[in-house]
């Protein structure tokens, strides 16, 4: 969940004879990776926070030790099943993109953004610096290792090769670069980006990434050459205040950001920014009104639609003028020319957080934090329908992530 003004000591208050050889190797790698991915179960990860609560009187923190990560099997996309949980720290203080699965389906990465520290009867959020690595091919899935990254690791991105990952560190004002080989994940470098980094996303060619600079209301650009990553501060784009959600279309033409505004659930309409992302100099081409607090967004596998988790006023105290009991899911269409339109909306539960498309793109899943459920929505053309099916979860769903 977005937190404006997150000093470490403030309690939670709201919510390519060599060319041929290389070509053959590349083809072989593609075949192996594709086969591995095809054989891997269609899992989605859900981070379950057990230490931060949205009570009628306002937000409240509690002790550590009650978080977990759930593994959802979406073989039947209309009826996902929770098949396993692991007791691992994670937090709603990290954005709903603080976990993900490698393209071959082998590993899950989960950032632990904060831990709680007790002072008297109150619990205060303190930045953590850990990344959990889960072997999803093990039976049952198991924790392989925990890797140190930057302070308050938040959004995670994994490139299409599955060999490189980036972690946005909010309190660290940085992005950590990691290599992935088999089940081994290693930190290569941490890059200063100059502002709080809430989320990160790769361009499909892996040569560029984007980083959401939360408090600066900017989208940063990273250039990538192998494992060398450089922050291109001269290419920063103005998006919207509280930029939190971030996604790039599969063809790399368009990037979207969810801008939660100066304060979450304040009753004011917020925006999604549309970026033409494939030029030498990316540019913002539009801003769409989306409602109060677009917490997270996802782009369909075919790149034709995006779905947005809109909290509305559900994270506010019930006596607040901005309070609403429920959130919403908004559906956006993405045209071949890059034009983005809002085409549908459906009601959701209380304090919507993570949002992902099913592997086929026919369904959208959204986590309803307070309700402790996963909502299932059907996408047909430009329509979005609540199927009515809810997956009951053993904790509060703070994040969702797939491949």
Positions of predicted regions on the chain:
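Positively charged n-region of N-terminal signal peptides that target proteins for export
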Residues: 3, 16-19
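Bacterial N-terminal signal peptides
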Residues: 25-34
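Predominantly soluble domains enriched in secretory-pathway, periplasmic, or organellar proteins
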Residues: 37-403
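Short, positively charged and aromatic/hydrophobic N-terminal segments
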Residues: 11-12
């Amino acid at each position: 969940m977005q937190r404006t003004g997150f000093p470490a000591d403030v309690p939670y208050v709201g919510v390519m004879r060599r060319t041929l050889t290389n070509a053959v190797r590349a083809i072989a790698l593609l075949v192996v990776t594709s086969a591995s991915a095809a054989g891997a179960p269609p899992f989605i990860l859900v981070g379950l926070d057990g230490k931060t609560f949205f009570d009628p009187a306002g937000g409240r923190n509690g002790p550590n030790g009650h978080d977990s990560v759930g593994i959802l099997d979406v073989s039947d996309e209309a009826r996902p099943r929770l098949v396993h949980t692991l007791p691992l720290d994670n937090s709603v203080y990290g954005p709903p993109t603080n976990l993900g699965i490698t393209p071959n389906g082998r590993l899950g990465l989960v950032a632990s953004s904060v831990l709680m520290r007790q002072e008297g009867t109150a619990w205060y959020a303190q930045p953590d610096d850990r990344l959990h690595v889960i072997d999803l091919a093990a039976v049952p899935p198991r924790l392989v290792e925990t890797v140190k990254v930057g302070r308050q690791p938040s959004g995670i991105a994994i490139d299409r090769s599955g060999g490189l990952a980036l972690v946005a560190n909010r309190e660290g004002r940085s992005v950590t670069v990691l290599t992935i080989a088999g089940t081994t994940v290693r930190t290569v470098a941490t890059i200063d980006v100059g502002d709080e980094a809430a989320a990160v996303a790769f361009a499909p060619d892996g040569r560029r990434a984007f980083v959401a600079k939360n408090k600066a209301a900017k989208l940063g650009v990273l250039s990538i050459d192998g494992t060398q990553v450089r922050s291109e501060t001269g290419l920063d784009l103005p998006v919207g205040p509280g930029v939190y959600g971030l996604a790039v279309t599969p063809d790399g033409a368009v990037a979207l950001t969810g801008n939660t505004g100066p304060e979450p659930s304040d009753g004011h309409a917020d925006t999604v920014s549309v970026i033409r992302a494939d030029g030498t100099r990316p540019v913002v081409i539009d801003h769409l009104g989306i409602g109060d607090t677009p917490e997270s967004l996802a782009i369909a596998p075919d790149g034709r639609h995006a779905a947005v988790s809109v909290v509305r006023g559900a994270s506010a105290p019930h006596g607040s003028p901005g309070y609403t009991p429920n959130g919403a899911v908004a559906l956006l269409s993405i045209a071949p020319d890059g034009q983005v339109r809002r085409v549908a909306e459906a009601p959701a539960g209380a304090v919507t957080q993570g949002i992902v498309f099913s592997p086929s793109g026919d369904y959208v899943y959204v986590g309803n934090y307070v309700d402790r459920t996963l909502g299932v929505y059907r996408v047909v053309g430009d329509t979005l329908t609540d199927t009515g099916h809810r997956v009951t979860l053993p904790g509060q769903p703070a994040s969702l992530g797939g491949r």
